From Swiss-Prot:
Domain CRM span(s) in chain numbering: 167-263, 371-468, 582-682
Basic and acidic residues biased stretches: 831-842
Coiled-coil ranges from the UniProt annotation: 703-732
Domain of life (superkingdom): Eukaryota
One family name in Pfam for this protein: CRS1_YhbY
Native source species: Zea mays (Maize)
Gene this protein is translated from: CFM3
Feature: compositional bias, Polar residues: 280-290
Region (Disordered): 49-80, 141-160, 254-290, 768-842
Official protein name in the record: CRM-domain containing factor CFM3, chloroplastic/mitochondrial
Length: 842
């Protein structure tokens, strides 16, 4: 029967309700007990009994099945647990399963260290502490079993924007007010100035006829709606019941019609102690002694608590607010539209723009005091100013003498002056404001942003009384000095000067000429010429030393360039292939040359020369055509010839021709009759694009330094020869030689030459930096990609001025028919010397 009824039970009983029914009365494991009841605190009320949907058991069924499987529908407890509870109430208490367990060793004993409970892990020392269970499990209840925290205790980010309204108003009333706010069509618009006095008056005017006012925010206040929420409630005294985006619904409150209670200061402890017994009884002496003592003790306790709260918490705040209010009232009118908290700042725009006779305050730095602020002091002052309310609200950028005068008065009682910038004011610049205030007051600006400007009065600031005393002392000292000077002038005016019978000649030109004629060195008529020759020789020797120093410097730079070039060329390993090259006939060469020059597709070879990308693009061209045309801009035909032989050796093709075209030189290479595409298109023995550019730059640097070194060397040799010539004509002199030296070696020319040399060397450094940035581009070797690799015509003209003669000869050689070069190529193709020549040329 039990087996027969179980399917029906399982079918009709929902799984969720079955899990909620207790199936056993045995005590749970200790760790499970700890999980459900951590430290026996925070225990929740037992859940209500689940609905039993099972059928009524038949009389013939075994009662043990109900006890083992089911529970009582009335209480939700198992039948066995009910029987046991009745037996315990009747006095028949059986053995408790917890008491039947062996007793635990006493706490603190040696055996207690080795005790291990279920669900409790040992600590770092291998033992178990009394609080390990609590620390390990903590609040082990499930999230739905834990009590919900109040809205005010929730994190600020998790709170509802209207949590205060949800706490103070009933849900039905809050729902009604929100529906009423949705039906309101008119909205009060708040601009960039924030919650001003006009906005507050407009809201209160609407509250006379409506309970809820809708507010639409725009401008700067919309950037921080949480702050606007707080300011709106504080200014108007209402309650925000709904907020979404920049729209706010403001409720006037339940007791809006009632007059607002005036703020009264709390009673003193003595008044509380005197008034309380009078309220309790008209005659305290008629009370019993015990009652009077108890009343007196309760009064004393109440008074002490109230006094403590008033003194500890609220007294400093009230004192600060009162003092700052009095101080700001003395400085000027308040800015009533201030959106922040009290106290209201002084409206600096209502202060006088110009004050006649205003001067910056007199300042004197005490002896031994550092004038500037340290970093720590500056940080502390900024942190202090961050929490202070602003003292002034400023909206204009000029005519700030009235504000400066008020700041000086404020500095007598406060070391920091904080200025708030009005929002929504056009044509204002905080930087100009800060500069003008600093000039007028002499203070130190601590911080400046779009909202506040903070000034420190400075270490040399003096109060008005002390400054007046010091100025009086200074005026007194100045008057004494003026009196002494006047008396000294009067005494010198009345003094009689003795007159000499004969005027003296001391210090006159006659005395100097007479002394030179008696004691001076006599020079002959050629003395000036000798001095000029000596000066010229010294100048010439100095020029030689200077050029020798430049020569040594250039030699060091050239050695450095050679080292760098050698380091760059370590990865360059030219091909040394001993295979016999393929040959083509003269007719084939003629046809290939003609077809290659007519090809529209070509490759550009720039300043990088032959590198792995060049060979890769040649193989890519050979995939669809047999010929490849390469355009090269080189300085000489010898360079073009070297490049052509290098391309032939590295690619494995056959060099057809090298021709002079309008864009430079055209190199035509045939892929060969037995061409096979290699597995790796980029050869590993050549440089990469980046390294090829670095090698090109270092080669150009080395060539420029070589020319510079040769030029300096020739100049030094010529100067040394001229020095020898000057020694030969030292006695008789040579005016023509001196005139030639003056014209050739002037100091101005040397200075210009030095500047040219420095600019020449700096230009190469800039090219290196630009080339490094250029390497980040793509490796495509197309015509558009490598046009920038060619050197400019101006740079070529500047770099190759010494080799113009050689270039002319090369151009002349290239202008002749290329038959000689073609014949040389054909001659190379007849034997194995061609490959050796390629290696040597490379």
């Amino acid at each position: 029967m039990a087996m027969a009824s179980s399917p029906a039970c399982h079918f009709r009983h929902p799984p969720r309700l079955r899990l909620l029914l207790p199936l056993s009365t045995s005590a749970p494991h200790p760790w499970l007990y700890s999980w459900s009841h951590p430290r026996q605190r925070g225990r929740l009320r037992a859940p209500p009994a689940a609905l039993d949907l099972r059928p009524e058991p038949s009389p013939s069924s075994d009662s043990d099945d109900e006890d083992a499987v089911g529970a009582s529908r009335s209480s939700g407890r198992s039948t066995m647990s009910l029987i046991l509870s009745r037996l315990r109430r009747a006095g028949y208490s059986g053995e408790d399963p917890r008491a039947a367990a062996p007793p635990h060793p006493p706490r603190g004993s040696v055996e207690d260290v080795f005790r291990a409970d279920d669900g409790v892990l040992p600590n770092a020392r291998g033992g178990f502490d009394a609080d390990d269970e609590e620390r390990a499990l903590g609040d082990a209840r499930f999230p739905w079993e834990r009590p919900m925290p109040p809205p005010e205790a929730a994190p600020r980010s998790a709170r509802s924007p209207t949590w205060m309204a949800e706490l103070t108003l009933p849900a039905a009333e809050l729902r009604r007010l929100r529906h009423a706010a949705i039906r309101i069509k008119s909205r009060t618009k708040v601009g960039g100035a924030g919650v001003t006095r006009e906005i507050v008056e407009k809201i209160k005017e609407k509250w006379k006829t409506e309970e809820v006012v809708r507010v639409k925010v725009s401008g700067t206040p919309a950037l921080n709606m949480r702050l606007f929420h707080e300011i709106l409630e504080r200014k108007t005294g209402g309650l925000v019941i709904w907020r979404s985006g920049t729209s706010v619904s403001l409720y006037r409150g339940v007791d809006y019609d009632e007059p607002e209670p005036t703020k009264k200061s709390k009673k003193n402890s003595q008044s509380l102690a005197m008034d309380f017994p009078i309220k309790g009884s008209s005659n305290p002496s008629l009370l019993p002694t015990e009652t009077a003592n108890s009343v007196r003790d309760s009064n004393v306790a109440l008074v002490s608590n109230a006094a403590k709260e008033e003194l500890v918490v609220q007294a400093p705040e009230i004192k600060y607010e009162d003092e700052i209010d009095k101080l700001l009232d003395e400085l000027g009118p308040r800015y009533t539209d201030w959106p922040g908290s009290d106290p209201l700042p002084v409206d600096a725009d209502l202060l006088p723009a110009n004050m006649p006779g205003y001067k910056p305050p007199f300042r004197v730095l005490p002896y031994g005091v550092r004038p500037s602020l340290s970093r720590r002091d500056t940080t502390n002052l900024r942190r202090l100013a961050r929490g202070l309310p602003p003292h002034f609200a400023l909206g204009r950028s000029r005519q700030l003498q009235g504000l400066a005068n008020a700041m000086v008065k404020l500095w007598e009682k406060s070391s920091i002056a904080k200025i708030a910038l009005k929002r929504g004011v056009q044509l204002t610049t905080s930087e100009r404001m800060a500069e003008d205030i600093k000039k007028l007051t002499g203070g130190v600006m601590l911080s400046r942003n779009n909202e506040f400007i903070v000034f420190y009065r400075g270490k040399d600031f003096l109060s008005s009384e002390l400054a007046e005393v010091l100025l009086e002392r200074e005026r007194l000292a100045k008057s004494l000095q003026d009196e002494e000077e006047a008396r000294r002038k009067a005494a010198s005016y009345f003094s009689s000067a003795e007159t000499y019978a004969q005027p003296t000649v001391a210090g006159t030109l006659g005395e100097t000429l007479e002394a030179n004629s008696k004691y001076g060195t006599k020079h002959d008529e050629n003395h000036a010429d000798k001095m000029a020759r000596t000066i010229e020789a010294a100048r010439h020797a100095d020029l030689v030393r200077k050029l020798e120093w430049k020569l040594s410097l250039a030699q060091k730079k050239m050695e450095k360039a050679e080292r760098v070039l050698g380091k760059v060329e370590t990865a360059l390993r030219p091909t040394e292939d001993s295979r016999p090259p393929e040959t083509i006939t003269d007719e084939e060469r003629f046809m290939f040359r003609k077809l290659g020059l007519r090809m529209k597709a070509f490759l550009l070879l720039g300043r990088r020369g032959v590198f792995d990308g060049t060979i890769e693009n040649m193989h890519l061209h050979w995939k669809y055509r047999e010929l490849v045309k390469i355009l090269v801009k080189a300085k000489s035909f010898a360079d073009v010839k070297r490049i052509a032989l290098s391309l032939e050796a590295e690619s494995g093709g056959i060099l057809v021709s090298v021709d002079k075209v309008s864009k430079g030189y055209a190199i035509v290479v045939f892929r060969g009759k037995n061409y096979r595409r290699p597995s790796s298109l980029r050869p590993r023995n050549l440089l990469s694009k980046r390294k090829a550019l670095a090698r090109s730059i270092e080669l150009q640097r080395h060539q420029a330094l070589s020319r510079h070194f040769a030029k300096l060397n020739r100049k030094v040799e010529r100067l040394k020869a001229e020095l020898v010539q000057m020694e030969d004509v030292k006695e008789q002199g040579d005016e023509e030689l001196y005139a030639k030296l003056d014209a050739a070696y002037s100091s101005d020319d040397e200075d210009m030459e030095d500047e040219d040399d420095e600019a020449y060397l700096k230009r190469f450094d800039n090219e290196v930096a630009g080339a490094t940035a250029d390497d980040d581009g793509s490796d495509d070797y197309t015509s558009a990609a490598d046009e920038a690799d060619y050197p400019d015509s101006d740079d070529e003209a500047g770099d190759c001025s010494e080799d113009e003669g050689e270039d002319d000869e090369d151009e002349a050689a290239a202008g002749v028919s290329d038959a000689g070069f073609h014949g040389e190529v054909v001659g190379f193709s007849s034997d194995t010397d061609r490959r050796n020549h390629d290696v040597n040329e490379y």
